[in-house]
Regions:
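Proline-centered loop/turn at the N-terminus of a beta-strand
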Residues: 83-87
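Short, charged N-terminal beta->alpha structural module
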Residues: 1-31
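Short acidic, S/G/P-rich loop/turn micro-motifs used as interaction or catalytic elements
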Residues: 11-14, 33-34, 56-66, 93-95
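Glycine-rich, charge-decorated loop segments at or immediately adjacent to ligand/cofactor-binding or catalytic sites
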Residues: 88-106
Length: 128
């Protein structure tokens, strides 16, 4: 069964190509700043994706500087409500620091080393 992967701008094209070659679809998702596709806050039950992938800097914005823009908590909320796993590509050596930037990281969010992204994404997609 075809699954859909929402990806933030800059996501590794090799990863996306591998997932397409496995029979999945990809959909660009915008963080609100880059206009890179459907705005992440517009994801709902009718247009939900099966997996979101991206980088920490695509969901993390200094809230005091940009109070009216979507925050990582908005992304986490969407992931929790619709059961969408979020893979954030972070080198293993930086994962603890990345996690400390984001308060209340839900279990549905994983920090994944770049070398493991394809494997982890396929495992999630195959288990759904």
């Amino acid at each position: 069964m075809r699954k859909s992967i929402g990806y933030f701008e800059g996501t590794d094209s090799t990863l996306l190509t591998a997932l397409v070659c496995e029979g999945h679809d990809t959909l660009p998702v915008s963080n609100g700043f880059d206009s890179h596709g459907m705005h992440v806050r517009l994801i709902n039950e009718q247009n939900r994706v099966d997996l979101l992938v991206g980088y920490v800097h695509k969901i993390f914005a200094p809230e005091p500087l940009l109070p009216h823009q979507p925050s990582y908590q908005d992304v986490f909320h969407i992931c929790r409500i619709y059961g969408i796993p979020l893979l954030l590509e972070v080198p293993e050596a930086l994962q603890e620091k990345a996690a400390s930037l984001l308060e209340g990281v839900p279990d549905i969010v994983q920090f994944v080393d770049p070398a493991d992204m394809e494997r982890v994404a396929k495992e999630i997609l195959n288990d759904q």
